[in-house]
């Protein structure tokens, strides 16, 4: 009887660990329609292995309850298969977080990576080592796991994502000799190297400050005080002008507005005219690519 009670106690502790240990609730999809003549079960197993790697691994020392896990998705579109086990394509990474005291979920990151190139061998486990060598697939998934965590933590506390961004930067540094693209500065200005470079660059610290103030002091306040929350978002976006005027046309700025342009218009469209003009002047300066969307902010309201 005593042994049985001890067994159930150990089982309870073990189950509690697995319920609370993992940080991500990441939906994975692998689209392989462009690849012909391949065993489709291979891609089912590939998707399952990626899902288990991201969702079952513990990425930090922090404890998450089941309903606190970070909502995210990774959509992989494979364009070609080289040989039996090498694949190339693109990846869309999307991260969202709940807004306090509401049913609304806000997008933190909506990022497209066009430099996806990895080897996947069926039935070979995906294992990550912080000190040893990893496959490019494992490095890709670990890099984005840390980016996802870092962005989420930044939205709840000022510079809260530092540890995760440091780990992502370490992964990039270790991949400088990789034959696969996306890791190096000279390949193009919009890849993994420049994403983490911008996040770690002190010149863009005001962008990360904006992420915190926009979400924690702005969106999270709006259910209790709409005016104060909207004003905090206005002031947060004003910080982006500081970064833009120091180093214009940054990749990080584009990544921010890819996630936020539509939401900003939705938040400020009901505001008073002077407030709408202020926000229009900010966002049209720092994000001219979405100027057609922002024009809705200065259109006169009709009854």
Where are the model-predicted features located?
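Bacterial Sec-dependent N-terminal signal peptides
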Residues: 1-24
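Start-of-domain marker
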Residues: 22-88, 99-101
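Sec-exported extracytoplasmic/periplasmic mature domains
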Residues: 51-59, 150-153, 265, 269
């Amino acid at each position: 009887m005593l042994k049985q009670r001890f067994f159930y106690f150990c089982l309870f502790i073990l189950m509690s660990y697995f319920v609370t240990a993992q940080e991500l609730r990441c939906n994975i999809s692998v689209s392989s329609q462009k690849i012909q003549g391949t065993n489709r079960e291979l891609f089912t197993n590939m998707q399952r292995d990626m899902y288990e790697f991201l969702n079952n691994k513990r990425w930090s020392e922090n404890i998450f309850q089941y309903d606190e896990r970070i909502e995210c998705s990774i959509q992989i579109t494979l364009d070609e298969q080289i040989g039996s086990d090498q694949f190339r394509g693109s990846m869309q990474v999307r991260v969202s977080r709940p807004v306090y005291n509401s049913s609304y979920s806000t997008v933190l990151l909506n990022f497209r990576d066009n430099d996806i190139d990895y080897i996947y061998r069926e039935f070979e486990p995906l294992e990550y080592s912080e000190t040893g060598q990893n496959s490019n697939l494992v490095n890709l998934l670990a890099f984005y796991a840390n980016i996802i965590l870092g962005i989420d933590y930044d939205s709840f506390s000022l510079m809260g994502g530092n540890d995760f961004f440091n780990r992502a930067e370490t992964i990039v540094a270790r991949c400088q000799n990789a034959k696969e693209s996306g890791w190096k500065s000279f390949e193009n200005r919009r890849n993994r190297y420049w994403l983490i470079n911008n996040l770690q660059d002190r010149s863009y610290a005001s962008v990360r400050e904006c992420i915190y103030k926009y979400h924690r002091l702005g969106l999270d306040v709006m259910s209790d005080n709409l005016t104060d929350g909207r004003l905090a978002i206005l002031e947060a976006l004003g910080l982006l002008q500081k970064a833009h005027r120091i180093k214009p046309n940054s990749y990080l700025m584009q990544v921010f507005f890819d996630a936020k342009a539509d939401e900003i218009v939705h938040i400020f469209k009901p505001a008073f005219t002077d407030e709408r003009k202020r926000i229009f002047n900010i966002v049209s300066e720092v994000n001219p690519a979405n100027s057609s969307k922002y024009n809705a902010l200065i259109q006169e309201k009709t009854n």
